[in-house]
Design a protein with these regions (language model features):
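N-terminal secretory signal peptides that target proteins for export/translocation
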Residues: 1-14
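N-terminal intrinsically disordered, low-complexity segments enriched in P/E/S/T
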Residues: 2, 35-183
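Bacterial N-terminal signal peptides
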Residues: 19-32
Length: 183
């Protein structure tokens, strides 16, 4: 019916696909851990974010301090989403919150997000894992200043996920963000 060469090639092909998938899954698990093991350089510019608490990588006595360039070096993401506080559908750019937390080796179930005015709210770690929550530093191409909810604003992709339009989640949209404490 079938030649043994054909069956043997099919088995090798399936093994090859399985090995490739296993390698990709292993890299997805290992790379964030390896990245978190790398030392974090000291900020050269003004610190705009301090991550502290249950983290593995620090660069100050207080935790992991980031200037704007350090955050941008982690990779920028852009999302367009409406907010209850802006007109239209602004385009926000910044680093994903989960990327920052992975970089510092964060372990925990909640993150306390604090603003410059000391407003603090507890954010479930699941938010950062399940959604592309942005630590936005620009809105519509303009660097956000303190007077415009900057230098960092926690932005949820609410237009892409209707469940994020719940008014009870509005407290988590911390603007003028200064610190994240992992618990």
């Amino acid at each position: 019916m079938f030649s043994s060469g054909w069956v043997s090639g099919l088995v090798r092909g399936r093994v090859s696909v399985a090995a490739t998938a296993l390698t990709a899954m292993t890299m997805a698990l290992v790379l964030p851990a390896a990245w978190a093991a790398e030392p974090l350089p000291a900020p050269e510019g003004p610190v705009i974010l301090l991550v502290s608490g249950n983290i593995a990588v620090i660069n100050t006595d207080e935790g992991a301090a980031f200037d704007r360039e350090m955050l941008q070096a982690l990779g920028l993401t852009e999302i367009e989403t409406s907010t209850p506080w802006t007109d239209g559908v602004p385009a926000f750019s910044g680093v994903l919150a989960r990327t920052v937390l992975e970089r510092v080796g964060a372990e925990g179930s909640t993150v306390m997000a604090s603003a410059l005015n000391d407003y603090t709210v507890e954010v479930p770690m699941e938010d950062f894992q399940n959604f592309d929550v942005l630590l936005a530093t620009t809105m519509d191409g303009e660097e956000m200043k303190v007077s415009d909810k900057g230098p960092i604003w926690i932005v949820y992709p609410r237009d892409q996920h209707p469940e994020l339009q719940d008014r009870r989640l509005h407290d988590r949209w911390v603007w003028q963000l200064k610190a994240l404490r992992v618990q």
